[in-house]
């Protein structure tokens, strides 16, 4: 079966690129901020944690008991992704500011209660890179399962979009992050998956 997950991700990159070309990034952020509501605020502020390293660690542990091979490929993909993203954030793009830095002084800016806003190290989005790395590895392992691929790609996109909703990243940041995470995970899967067929089994603690 065709790797539908990757095709959908490519299409979202295309749509994102068009948006970046034709929309002013600050005006776009202002509109997103204004269309929000308290219900979305609750969902977004919790869903965004799926891009945290802690969430990735929990997924990796769970994967060990499903398929060791998948867990190891995900671990390598996540580690490489996190390293590259942090290198880019703190070297080449260390002066890049987050949307909140520019919008916090707007008179009609809609603040989310009890949410911690950050202002620096905007590019690329670490949360987006992390969730796409993890989801891409899992989706690759289930290439024959269309439903699993669709669930994973929708989940990854939603988690990345929370960063825009929360004014923590511009659209370009989450696209770059998703690009890094997806490509690293995809090529790691292609290279490592056939080499670790002997690990295509769950971890059993009683063995």
What positions do the PLM features span?
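Hydrophobic alpha-helical transmembrane segments
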Residues: 48-67, 127-132
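Alpha-helical transmembrane segments of integral membrane proteins
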Residues: 5-9, 69-77, 148-152, 172-176
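Membrane-helix interface segments
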Residues: 37-40, 67-71, 144-149
């Amino acid at each position: 079966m065709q790797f539908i997950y990757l095709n959908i991700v490519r299409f979202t990159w295309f749509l994102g690129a068009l948006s970046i070309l034709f929309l002013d990034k600050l005006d776009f952020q202002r509109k997103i901020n204004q269309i929000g509501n308290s219900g979305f605020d609750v969902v977004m502020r919790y869903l965004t944690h799926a891009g945290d390293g802690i969430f990735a660690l929990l997924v990796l542990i769970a994967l060990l008991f499903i398929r060791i091979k998948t867990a190891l490929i995900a671990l390598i993909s996540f580690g490489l992704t996190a390293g590259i993203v942090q290198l880019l954030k703190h070297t080449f793009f260390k002066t890049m500011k987050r949307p909140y830095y520019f919008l916090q002084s707007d008179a009609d800016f809609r603040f989310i209660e009890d949410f911690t806003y950050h202002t620096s190290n905007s590019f690329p989005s670490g949360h987006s890179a992390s969730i796409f790395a993890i989801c891409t590895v899992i989706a690759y392992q289930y290439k024959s399962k269309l439903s699993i691929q669709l669930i994973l790609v929708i989940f990854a996109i939603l988690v990345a979009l929370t960063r825009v909703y929360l004014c923590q990243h511009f659209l370009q940041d989450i696209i770059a992050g998703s690009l890094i995470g997806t490509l690293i995970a995809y090529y790691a899967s292609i290279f490592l998956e056939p080499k670790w067929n002997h690990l295509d089994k769950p971890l059993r603690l009683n063995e």
